[in-house]
C-alpha cells in the first residue's frame, strides 16, 4: 500500500469465474506521511482510506466484468461501518461482491478483514462510464500488472 498516493491494493488474490466476487490484499506500510497527522504518536489508518481500499477492490472487479471497456467511479458510500483500528504493518484482506448492475451503475457489498477479524464494511455504488480522454486507461493497465491482476484474461487483444 502507498496510501499517500492512493495505491491501496497490493495484490489481486482471486476473482471468481462468474465475476461476482473478488479478494485483494493490502499491507499497511510501517511508515507513511499520512501517519504524521493521523495521529502523532498513535498512528492509525484513516477510515476514509479503508473505504477507498474497498472501493479500489470493487473497481478491479468491475473492470474485469466489463473487460476494461469502461471505468468505474465511486458514486455513493452507504452503510459504512468501521469496527476497529488498523495500525501500520497490518495485512488487510479486501473483499467485494456485486449485488446489482444496470443502467450504468454497479452496487457492491464490500468488507475488510485482518487475520479473519472484521475491520470495516460498506455498500458502495459506482457509476460506470467511458474512459476519460488521455492516458488514464494506460495508467490503470500498468497498475493492473503491479497488483498481479490477470490482465490477459480480462482485456480484449
Language model: regions and residue ranges:
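Hydrophobic residues on conserved beta-strands that form the core of alpha/beta folds
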Residues: 9-10, 77, 107, 121
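Hydrophobic core residues within well-ordered beta-strands of beta-rich domains
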Residues: 6-8, 92, 106
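Short aromatic-glycine motifs in intrinsically disordered, low-complexity regions
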Residues: 1-3, 67
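Conserved positions in beta-strands of structured domains
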Residues: 10-13, 78, 83, 97-99, ...
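HotDog/MaoC-like acyl-thioester-processing domains
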Residues: 88, 99-157
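Compact, glycine-rich, soluble single-domain proteins
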Residues: 39-46, 50-59, 74
Amino acid at each position: 500500500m502507498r496510501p499517500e498516493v492512493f495505491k491501496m491494493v497490493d495484490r489481486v488474490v482471486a476473482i471468481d469465474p462468474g465475476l461476482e466476487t473478488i479478494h485483494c490484499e493490502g499491507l499497511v506500510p510501517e511508515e507513511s506521511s499520512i501517519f504524521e497527522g493521523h495521529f502523532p504518536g498513535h498512528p492509525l489508518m484513516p477510515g476514509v482510506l479503508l473505504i477507498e481500499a474497498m472501493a479500489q477492490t470493487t473497481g478491479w472487479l468491475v473492470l474485469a466484468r466489463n473487460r476494461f471497456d469502461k471505468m468505474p467511479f465511486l458514486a455513493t458510500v452507504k452503510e459504512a461501518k468501521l469496527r476497529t483500528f488498523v495500525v501500520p504493518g497490518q495485512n488487510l484482506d479486501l473483499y467485494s461482491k456485486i449485488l446489482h448492475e444496470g443502467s450504468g451503475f454497479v452496487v457492491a457489498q464490500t468488507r475488510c478483514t485482518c487475520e479473519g477479524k472484521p475491520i470495516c464494511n460498506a455498500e458502495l455504488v459506482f457509476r460506470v462510464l467511458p474512459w476519460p480522454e488521455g492516458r488514464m486507461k494506460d495508467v490503470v493497465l500498468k497498475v493492473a500488472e503491479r497488483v498481479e491482476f490477470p490482465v490477459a484474461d480480462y482485456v480484449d487483444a
